[in-house]
Amino acid sequence: MTYKLILLRHGHSEWNAKNLFTGWVDVDLNDQGREEAARGGELLVENNVLPDVLYTSLLKRAINTANIALDKADRGWIPVKRDWRLNERHYGALQGKDKAQTLAEYGEEQFMEWRRSYDTPPPPLDDDSEFSQAHDPRYADLGDALPRTECLKDVLIRLMPYWESDIKEDLKAGKTVLVTAHGNSLRALVKHLDGISDEAIAGLNIPTGIPLVYDLDENFKPLNPGGTYLDPEAAAESIKAVANQGKK
């Protein structure tokens, strides 16, 4: 028995374009992002990789990416499951800050530690910040579980129970699963799937809007380690752009 998992990072967002740390701030796609999402759906059709069920975060840039892609693929009718555990990493007090200014203010070592280290979160975000989710009704049931900051390790810890209880169960049922989420929630999942070390994960970037397909064996180990991008050339270019964020 083999399983098929499709990972799709949301398209370019309004804050990607402004080079701001986004995290849990609910910004939408820009025109480029909507075009990327549409192209992602076209790639699913061209490669005959059509999902049976969709998982997304609670953030509109992921939700709208999925909606656009599925519309292009004529799969808007499939079941949808949304969960906060697929949200982007919470960037704490960095949310809303300009990446280039943060780099200049704190230096490259601190900047990269906050942005890319596995287990070092940024300073926490105050609940009275305009970028806080402390009073957001979609997270009202989380209570003390609502993060004020996260590192990638925290994202993995919150994501793994959902992977085990829900996503894997749909895969076991023979469904092709599409997970439309965010750079860091997908990096956490890829780290788990590919067994990437805590140190090596710092160098992994995931492009926006390009489906990444994993074929998994009966033990949910990749038959194609690293997955297969449905547009490898575009993925390589986009990965470079993601890696350079904060340097402009």
UniProtKB/Swiss-Prot annotation:
Pathway connected to this protein: Carbohydrate degradation; glycolysis; pyruvate from D-glyceraldehyde 3-phosphate: step 3/5
Alphabetical keyword list: Gluconeogenesis, Glycolysis, Isomerase
Annotated catalysed reactions: (2R)-2-phosphoglycerate = (2R)-3-phosphoglycerate
UniProt KW Manganese keyword: no
One annotated GO biological process: gluconeogenesis
GO MF: phosphoglycerate mutase activity
CDD domains: HP_PGM_like
Enzyme nomenclature, EC number: 5.4.2.11
UniProt site positions, description: Transition state stabilizer: 182
InterPro entries tied to this protein: His_Pase_superF_clade-1 (IPR013078), His_PPase_superfam (IPR029033), Phosphogly_mut1 (IPR005952)
Active site: 10, 88
Gene3D superfamilies the UniProt entry points to: Phosphoglycerate mutase-like
UniProt: substrate binding residues: 9-16, 22-23, 61, 88-91, 99, 115-116, 183-184
Homology family: Belongs to the phosphoglycerate mutase family. BPG-dependent PGAM subfamily.
Role according to the record: Catalyzes the interconversion of 2-phosphoglycerate and 3-phosphoglycerate.
Protein name, per record: 2,3-bisphosphoglycerate-dependent phosphoglycerate mutase
Species of provenance: Arthrobacter sp. (strain FB24)
Source lineage: Bacteria, Bacillati, Actinomycetota, Actinomycetes, Micrococcales
Gene: gpmA
